[in-house]
Each structure stands twice: as structure tokens, then as C-alpha cells.
Amino acid sequence: SDDFQRQVLAARELAKIKAAEEEASRLKAIAKQAADAAIADAESRMAWANENQIRADYEQEYKNASVAMVSAYVAYGNEDYLLSKQKAEEVSGIFSNDFQAQVAADRAAKEQLAKDKAAADEVMPKARDRMVWADQNNIKTDYSAVYNSAHSAMEAAEKAYQIEKYAA
């Protein structure tokens, strides 16, 4: 009968709709799970950035990551999990392992430069005083080779100090 056929077609159509809804729900759950993982990584990297005061030395990178993090949260709240994941991954890309290693290297170099400068600041005045003493006592006349060597070394040290090559 026609009624039976319509019922069968309606049931089939309803089953297709239900299957499509279940598939959409499954895909949404997968996207949410991926966004959750990406956000967790991004949050970890933002925490690292905050603990290491990245905002002070890398202001633009920090700003870009902060904007992306907020965007990830907003997209997540709107259940746009793909965009949320994308924005969270942007944060992770900005504060990547390579970036973290570069920050550590930059800071180690800066710390070493400060140590080298402190050492130079301690010895340079003494060396200058000794050169003044040598000049006042006319050491160049009696010990010209030693004086010339010391004078050349002092000039090199002054030039190195001016260009922040303190360990030279």
C-alpha cells in the first residue's frame, strides 16, 4: 500500500538523518578532543612564557601568542573546535621548542656578557693605571719591547671593551 511505502521511505529518511547527526556528533567530538589537546599544549607554553617573563624581551611574540590564545578560547566557547585548535597551535608555534631554546641561548649569552663585563670592569682600571705608571716612569725608554707589547695589548683591550668583546 501507498501508506506503507511512505512509512518505509520516511523511516529510511529518518534513519539517514539520524546517521548523519550521529556522524556529525562523532566528528564534533573528535574535533573537540583535538582542540582540548592543542589548548593544553598552548596553555603549557603560555605558562612557560609567563614564568620566563617573555613579555619583557619578546613583546611582539608574546602579544601575538596572547591574541591567539584568547581567540582559541573564544572559538572553543563557540564550539568551533577546528578554529580553536588552529589558534592554539598558533600559540604553540610561536612559543615552539626552537623558540624556547633560542630564548635560553640568548639569555645565557646575555648573562655571560654581563659576567665578562664585570670581570673587564674590574681589571681595565688596573691595566690603565699600570700604563699611566709606565708612561710616568718612562718605561718605554728602558724596556721598549715590553712597553710596546703592553701598549698594543692595552689598545686592543680598549677597542674590544668598546665593542663589548669583554672576554677578548
For each of these PLM feature ranges, what is it?
Residues 1-168:
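Long, charged/polar, soluble alpha-helical segments
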